[in-house]
Amino acid sequence: MWRAEGKWLPKTSRKSVSQSVFCGTSTYCVLNTVPPIEDDHGNSNSSHVKIFLPKKLLECLPKCSSLPKERHRWNTNEEIAAYLITFEKHEEWLTTSPKTRPQNGSMILYNRKKVKYRKDGYCWKKRKDGKTTREDHMKLKVQGVECLYGCYVHSSIIPTFHRRCYWLLQNPDIVLVHYLNVPAIEDCGKPCGPILCSINTDKKEWAKWTKEELIGQLKPMFHGIKWTCSNGNSSSGFSVEQLVQQILDSHQTKPQPRTHNCLCTGSLGAGGSVHHKCNSAKHRIISPKVEPRTGGYGSHSEVQHNDVSEGKHEHSHSKGSSREKRNGKVAKPVLLHQSSTEVSSTNQVEVPDTTQSSPVSISSGLNSDPDMVDSPVVTGVSGMAVASVMGSLSQSATVFMSEVTNEAVYTMSPTAGPNHHLLSPDASQGLVLAVSSDGHKFAFPTTGSSESLSMLPTNVSEELVLSTTLDGGRKIPETTMNFDPDCFLNNPKQGQTYGGGGLKAEMVSSNIRHSPPGERSFSFTTVLTKEIKTEDTSFEQQMAKEAYSSSAAAVAASSLTLTAGSSLLPSGGGLSPSTTLEQMDFSAIDSNKDYTSSFSQTGHSPHIHQTPSPSFFLQDASKPLPVEQNTHSSLSDSGGTFVMPTVKTEASSQTSSCSGHVETRIESTSSLHLMQFQANFQAMTAEGEVTMETSQAAEGSEVLLKSGELQACSSEHYLQPETNGVIRSAGGVPILPGNVVQGLYPVAQPSLGNASNMELSLDHFDISFSNQFSDLINDFISVEGGSSTIYGHQLVSGDSTALSQSEDGARAPFTQAEMCLPCCSPQQGSLQLSSSEGGASTMAYMHVAEVVSAASAQGTLGMLQQSGRVFMVTDYSPEWSYPEGGVKVLITGPWQEASNNYSCLFDQISVPASLIQPGVLRCYCPAHDTGLVTLQVAFNNQIISNSVVFEYKARALPTLPSSQHDWLSLDDNQFRMSILERLEQMERRMAEMTGSQQHKQASGGGSSGGGSGSGNGGSQAQCASGTGALGSCFESRVVVVCEKMMSRACWAKSKHLIHSKTFRGMTLLHLAAAQGYATLIQTLIKWRTKHADSIDLELEVDPLNVDHFSCTPLMWACALGHLEAAVVLYKWDRRAISIPDSLGRLPLGIARSRGHVKLAECLEHLQRDEQAQLGQNPRIHCPASEEPSTESWMAQWHSEAISSPEIPKGVTVIASTNPELRRPRSEPSNYYSSESHKDYPAPKKHKLNPEYFQTRQEKLLPTALSLEEPNIRKQSPSSKQSVPETLSPSEGVRDFSRELSPPTPETAAFQASGSQPVGKWNSKDLYIGVSTVQVTGNPKGTSVGKEAAPSQVRPREPMSVLMMANREVVNTELGSYRDSAENEECGQPMDDIQVNMMTLAEHIIEATPDRIKQENFVPMESSGLERTDPATISSTMSWLASYLADADCLPSAAQIRSAYNEPLTPSSNTSLSPVGSPVSEIAFEKPNLPSAADWSEFLSASTSEKVENEFAQLTLSDHEQRELYEAARLVQTAFRKYKGRPLREQQEVAAAVIQRCYRKYKQYALYKKMTQAAILIQSKFRSYYEQKKFQQSRRAAVLIQKYYRSYKKCGKRRQARRTAVIVQQKLRSSLLTKKQDQAARKIMRFLRRCRHSPLVDHRLYKRSERIEKGQGT
């Protein structure tokens, strides 16, 4: 089978064939004849060799007509295989001699037997041994069949330069070799960057070469790569010589390590060859990404012999020249710089190469011509414009902007008919904006001389190709269809399998008519991107709801001056979902939803001058551009809805004047004016009609700025200094980058027919906190009325006359309020843009919280950027670097563009950045001196993000204070930044939670409120004014932000914690304390009180939370000397003062040691006052007379809690379902129960701490009267009583639980306790109430939170009550003891830090009066004596036992602390009732600790009378059990509420009790163990003894056996000897006879011989013979 016509295939091929035989195809092989293979001696075997190839391969691969000489991207596996199986062409293609240093892109076919193709003159990377080349080998699959072998090497000089050799496994002699330099475009973000940046190899490597040698090596490597960065301004090229020189210099001078000057020259606006630092230090290529090549041929033109799939699917493009071009006869313009575009191939499907990453495309030489500077892509404005176009592309989208001069854009217009070719590149610049689908990037070229902007976002707007062709030659577009696997992976389109998506050209509606050459028609065919898969469903749904359904508008308006903004629109559809929240995903926008908006506007815009200024303005639109009516691109049939800002314009025939006075009459009713602001809008100001023409630049600038005075501040931030703040776009419409909102909001269709409600409910509020608060403020700017406030992008009215945004509302349909959707204010309910014309066309404007997303929705990073809107950097990591830079920094935010136009500014040093996945930019920080610098993201050199702080740290310093001692140091900026980050994170989280609900509401109401917005509207305004007033102070601004966030009721929903990064483990409260922001702290307390159920808040705002070095917020305030903040924190929760940091230092100690003596004294004074109060009535609560005071106490709690007693009874206990998440963690409602910050109720764990109760009671009695917050409903105790009176106990309980449950965040937990107990429950109940509230879900006695049922009031009740009562007394004592202890503690903070809590607790317990220790001591216990009965006690036992099973690991405080790290009981345990089953199922097994069963045995031993004497000593008395129970309960509560943060008091008491019981238990257990051990030993000994005996007997048996065996062997031996003797004898006898015979024979022989002797008588002889024969006688 392997033999093919007499010649054996090479061994490898045999093997691989055998593999292919089994490759799964039924007929496994097909024979192909291969040209004769010559053996090494050159003898050609004339017969053809047959090669076995899997049938599958032959079926799926086309034969190739030509092998391209160069290709500037990696081939896909299919292409490689196709070249290698086209055997019949190999002779023609084979190169017979090795080439020296083939150029970048070269593809060469060699026969390895004839050519030593590896000796190519390049220096390839060697292995560590320095001898052999480092090769990577891999087998590649085609159609699932392994058939190719690849061998890859890369240059040791330029690591991005690779040589890849491929051969068929079945025919290894023919090798396809491909040389390619793939600069890390994705790494450095600009095609030029990578070239240099990638050259960061060792100096050693470079040192070996002379300059000439280097140039010789490098020149071919960089063949075809364009050197300019064309960041928009510079087109200066660079030569290899300069590169080499620069590198050599840099290596000699040793600049900061790992940074290299990049030739990007793109710092904002800087022209020419100013080199800014590109320091992308790490530009090594990992997987080669695209090559930026715009060489002599167009970037993709492959000069090739002929194209791969040439003959196969030729699209009949309307003209015939395409073939020639395709064949490489025409140098192609550089158009799409794409990873895989080959201009040449027609519709060939290039399948992505799985093994080689086929890179994302790059727009390689943007504006390579120096004189093109004013083309749209250049300069700031144009940059903006482009950006805007780009903003909307999907993640993998790249925007190709290439200025093609004198060549048509080669791309394909998808449906072959002439009506597609979007108008031609005439002398006028036709912008071809085509967003193509499915990863195939096509630009739809314009053919015909009219200028046209054709925006065809086809199926998925993957790449926006903006190419302005400056020459009118009508070249036929060629399809550049490439499947870009990266795009595909990120955004797999519908129906596309990995093999390469079929072009869905049919999507593009073919109605775009080619309008006659004279006209400039811009047709936007926006066929929306099919379903872009998104992550944010909430938005999706909302979108799907029709808000955008209409959105694909085709604007055919001739005069649509597409300034940056407008161009965006269509592309907006492409937004691909990005991972960051910011991105809107339109995925569910149903594709075919209605493109009702097909329409065309005709009109002329006389005013557009042909100014060179960059813009998408038609440069010579001076003649009116009538558009034919039929340019309607009727999108209605095209399949995806395009999510453009264009709203459904149902019927309106008003004209929108897009430019100055152009009156475009909109013929079709559904006119969508994509009035994307800017150019479309005249500068709106009092000046009314500043037509484009008239307004000179200066004027324009003034105008615009006027137009948003409010904007003034924003514009300051964003305007590039360039033109006086106003960038003039062509025709004098000033484009104000400061229009902060521009990009954000959809253009309101002024003339929309009524129904167009556009609800852009933006989803995520990321933007809201700009880390630089200045930005923040801008974001919060809100409308104060007066058209001046409209953001610069006032949505212009659709007034048919002109855009003059006249002051009168009628003209300017959007009143400012509607327009200025202030960017971020969360409150921004729904602004509606009601256009004056279509009254109802209100755009229920987004909840701004979500504006950002809208922005994304709009697609528009670019837009935003263009409009000066700033994006939020949501996160970046790492936040620092050493001074030499070179660290990879990832920055997350709403970045969408897959183009390489991003850069990051580190303190104004620009470095290229690349989008490694939607929402994540990567850059490498430049070298910089130590210190903090701002880090911002720029797109096309326009800054588009807020600034965040990046730190350069000196090498000497550790990253973070590694020792506790440097810890409490402050870096203001860093802390401020962190505050903002924390808020941002919370806000994002909030947005996630609210998103869905708000969408529902929003989409429901197109009217102003949109449902959810109404509530927030008010605060919006207030916030705005507030912001203005407070603007100066960072703290006040943050307070405003917090208040706004606070006013949104979205916190209760969170079910899971999300906490991204913390700064040194510090929460918001820590940061505020460190900065000394007392007002902020109070605000946070209020916030926490208000949203008591929010886990997020609880994490961020908790006075007892500690950072990485165990510092509480109070510790920070004390350490940094912030008196006011420290007092606020201390009052809120005084326990924090006794929490030491990891070095054991207490806050007061640190304050003193750092010289903040006043602060320390103040806090000590507060402490003393409290203790004094405690001292006055320590025992108030013990006697039966306690009731009144408790009532008042409760009442006071109640009032603190602000809760109104009449909480609906219907609310059931949610706490019960999930206490773990609810109250226990987020119990804050009591903490700051009132919104007053004056009496800070106990936060968190405090609850059960009895002593705390006391202090609380005493402390609160006075405070209750002075509660200052207005919102405390002053309910007098009496009113309180009345309510409770009516409650039946069960109701009361339910009330508690209700309190505990989140639904009414404001009601504090205590409300319930306040409201019931007072009246008819006696203190027993009261206690129950209190404890329950505190313990919420606490097992057993107070399981109200859990069981929320009357059962709580049953037998269990006495227990708990008793517990409380008992406890109380203990506590009184404890309180005073502790207070004194604390005073001492304050005095000598450092010494008693390590106070042994156990001893303390034991002292306390010893101090407990004896009467309390009496069994039946029942203070104020009316009904519950049954408590003492063993039954009840034992009922608690099972619980206690299981608890102790866990708790017994808490012998010492430290252990207790550790135990706190995991919950002891699951949250909704119903078995806690005494009657319930034992809770042992809850206990977590701790392997070596006694089990619950052991404990229960121990405890029951205590209650049973039949305990043996020895045991009697070891058991607990009932009282001890009671105490133990309380302690355990306390621990559990505290623990439950504060996983991980045991409180000091709880530790003291509980640990002591438990410790004591534990010791007894240990003795008991020890005794038991001894007994068991004795028994065990005895039994073991017995069995051991028996075993020993048995073994001995066994040994004897063995011996006997052995002896017997040896005896047997002996016998056998003897026998053998005997037989041997016999045999011997026999042998001997037989030998004897033999000898005798022999002797006789010898004699006879002798006689015979002698017979003839004359001496012998013959007769004698004969006779003897006869005798012998027996004849003789």
UniProtKB/Swiss-Prot annotation:
Short sequence motif named Nuclear localization signal, residue ranges:
112-119
Please tell me whether the keyword Transcription is annotated for this protein. yes
What positions does the domain IQ occupy?
Answer: 1547-1576, 1577-1599, 1600-1622
Where does the IPT/TIG domain start and stop, copy by copy?
A: 875-953
Q: Where in the cell is it found?
A: Nucleus; Cytoplasm
UniProt region (Disordered), positions on chain: 283-375, 990-1021, 1215-1246, 1264-1317
User: Which UniProt keywords are given for this protein, alphabetically ordered?
Assistant: Activator, ANK repeat, Cytoplasm, Intellectual disability, Nucleus, Repeat, Transcription, Transcription regulation
Could you say which tissues express the protein in this record? Normally expressed in non-neoplastic adult central nervous system tissues: detected in whole brain, cerebellum, brain cortex, occipital lobe, frontal lobe, temporal lobe, putamen. Expression levels are low in oligodendroglial tumors, and are reduced by half in oligodendroglioma and astrocytoma cases with 1p loss of heterozygosity. Detected in neuroblastic-type cultured neuroblastoma cells. Expressed in heart and kidney.
Q: What induces it?
A: Detected at low levels at interphase and in resting cells. Up-regulated during S phase and mitosis. Levels decrease at the end of mitosis.
Single GO cellular component term: cytoplasm
Location (main, coarse): nucleus
Map the ANK repeats onto residue numbers. Answer: 1064-1093, 1109-1129, 1143-1172
On assembly, the entry states: May interact with calmodulin.
**Disease affiliated with this protein:** Cerebellar dysfunction with variable cognitive and behavioral abnormalities: An autosomal dominant neurodevelopmental disorder characterized by mildly delayed psychomotor development, early onset of cerebellar ataxia, and intellectual disability later in childhood and adult life. Other features may include neonatal hypotonia, dysarthria, and dysmetria. Brain imaging in some patients shows cerebellar atrophy. Dysmorphic facial features are variable.
Q: What is this protein called?
A: Calmodulin-binding transcription activator 1
Source organism? Homo sapiens (Human)
Name of the coding gene: CAMTA1
